[in-house]
A protein has these predicted regions:
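A short, Lys/Arg-rich alpha-helix, primarily the initiator
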Residues: 1-16
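Residues that mark the N-terminal boundary/hinge immediately upstream of a DNA-recognition element
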Residues: 8, 19, 45-48, 59
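Alpha-helical residues within the helix-turn-helix
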Residues: 14, 25, 54
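Short alpha-helical DNA-recognition segment
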Residues: 17-36
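DNA major-groove recognition helix of helix-turn-helix/homeodomain DNA-binding modules
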Residues: 28, 47-62
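Short, conserved catalytic or interaction motifs in soluble domains
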Residues: 39
Length: 63
């Protein structure tokens, strides 16, 4: 996984003016789990990568 994944998903969320809570809800995960992904505490699975790409309108490769 791209080492910048945490930074990228945080930036994409903030660029869209979304709170962590709202983004997590829309992505189907808890706010705590999204926070862990954004801080790099946990690595996500392929299914979450695909959902992020679809949600933010970017390719999985970009993430």
């Amino acid at each position: 996984m791209n080492n910048n994944f945490s930074r990228i998903i945080t930036l994409l969320r903030k660029e869209r003016g979304l709170s962590q809570k709202k983004a997590a809800e829309d992505l189907g995960v808890s706010q705590a789990l999204l926070s862990h992904y954004e801080k790099g505490i946990r690595e996500c699975g392929l299914d979450f990568l695909v959902r992020c790409g679809d949600f933010y309108g970017v390719s999985v490769d970009y993430l």
